């Protein structure tokens, strides 16, 4: 096993003015659904337009057991304030699983935090979790181990299903830049999620 392949990556930076993790962690306007109100929900999507997977069909499956509560959001906010990205990762590691994400070619891993946000046309489902590191990354302690978050957003449009979409950040870290703003650093392009299939009308009372 060589180290070269594991070390080949480029850092991409995204200012966090209105992007999903800021909204995910800072907004308190969400819909609360108890476990008694809903059953397990499944959303399927196809990832497109990525630098590493361009030309391939990459399927993404998000399974939702329950939605995170306001208390969970506060825990993550405090953890990031105290320990920044590593504090956030450690807090996510200690949380119970509220869902699961599986990508083509992987066995999938647990989601630690899922938020439901109502929109005029439907709802957005936002999630973040600590990323499962590959053996080569951990063994060689490559630079990619710093990108230890996976986050995403699925925007469900009930009025026009063709307008449903989303984004997935497979490997990222949350930092504070020189201007004091939250910034998302990625070691590969964000994945655009299309062909959204909302099997159970996720986030609605049935």
Where do the protein language model's features map onto the residues?
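N-terminal secretory signal peptides that target proteins for export/translocation
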Residues: 1-14
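Intrinsically disordered, low-complexity, compositionally biased regions/tails
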Residues: 11, 21-22, 156
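Bacterial N-terminal signal peptides
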Residues: 17-29
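Sec/Tat signal peptide C-region and signal peptidase I cleavage site
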Residues: 30-35
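Long, low-hydrophobicity ectodomains and other hydrophilic envelope-associated domains
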Residues: 36-206
């Amino acid at each position: 096993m060589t180290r070269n392949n594991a070390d080949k990556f480029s850092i991409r930076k995204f200012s966090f003015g209105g992007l999903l993790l800021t909204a995910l962690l800072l907004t308190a306007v969400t819909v609360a659904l108890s476990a008694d109100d809903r059953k397990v929900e499944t959303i399927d999507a196809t990832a497109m337009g990525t630098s590493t997977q361009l030309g391939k069909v990459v399927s993404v499956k998000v399974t939702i057991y329950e939605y995170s509560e306001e208390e969970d959001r506060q825990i993550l906010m405090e953890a990031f304030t105290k320990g920044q990205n590593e504090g956030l990762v450690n807090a996510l590691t200690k949380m119970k699983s509220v869902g699961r994400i599986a990508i083509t070619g992987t066995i999938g891993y647990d989601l630690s935090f899922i938020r439901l946000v109502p929109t005029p046309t439907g709802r957005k489902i936002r999630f973040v979790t600590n990323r499962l590191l590959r053996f080569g990354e951990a063994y060689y302690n490559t630079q990619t181990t710093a990108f230890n978050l996976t986050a995403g957003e699925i925007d469900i449009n009930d009025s026009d299903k063709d307008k449903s979409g989303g984004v997935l950040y497979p490997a990222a870290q949350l930092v504070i830049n020189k201007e004091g703003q939250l910034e998302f650093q990625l070691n590969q392009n964000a994945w655009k999620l299309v062909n959204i299939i909302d099997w159970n009308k996720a986030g609605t009372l049935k």
